[in-house]
A protein has these predicted regions:
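Alpha-helical transmembrane helix bundles of large polytopic membrane transport and channel proteins
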Residues: 104-108
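A generic structural signal for short hydrophobic patches within well-formed alpha-helices
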Residues: 35, 122-123
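Active-site-adjacent beta-strand/loop module that shapes the phosphate/pyrophosphate-binding cleft
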Residues: 68-103, 115-120, 133-138
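N-terminal strand-loop-strand
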Residues: 1-30, 57, 79
């Protein structure tokens, strides 16, 4: 059975998408993660957005973009939230989801930076599979 990873495309007024820098890599990603038992896809997307970026939006702001093929063992269920000038500065965003550091075992945030990116930048910032999937969606 395929796992479902739920994520959110947070878009600003310039139609740029919010990306989180994946700690310990050169790649950026949208806030997303596996759906927990008992969660709806929307609840999962909201939780992941809060854990990975500290953003808490009302459920009514999320537009369901649907479920998409991603990997043989995983599908993506994506949502979209459009924001205005309230998010032009990303300095206050914080990741509160941690994993043990590979060498030290110290708690390490999943994301250690945030930025806005245009569609044209996705291929150079994201993993190829994610960039391809995001570019295939009309947002």
């Amino acid at each position: 059975m395929q796992q479902v990873s739920c994520g959110t495309l947070v878009l600003n007024s310039a139609r740029q998408v919010l990306l989180c820098h994946v700690t310990g890599t050169a790649s950026w990603d949208i806030p997303k993660g596996l759906q927990d038992p008992g969660e709806t896809p929307l609840q999962s997307a909201q939780r992941e957005l809060f854990e990975e970026a500290g953003l808490d939006f009302d459920a009514g702001l999320f537009e369901d973009l649907g479920e998409f093929a991603y990997r043989p063992d995983k599908r993506l269920h994506l949502f979209k939230v459009e924001v205005g000038e309230e998010l032009c500065n990303l300095d206050h965003l914080r990741c509160t989801s941690f994993f043990p550091h590979q060498r030290t075992g110290e708690p390490t945030p999943e994301a250690d930076g945030f930025r806005w990116a245009s569609r044209e930048e996705l291929s150079s910032l994201c993993w190829p599979r994610m960039a391809s999937r995001l570019l295939s969606i009309d947002w």
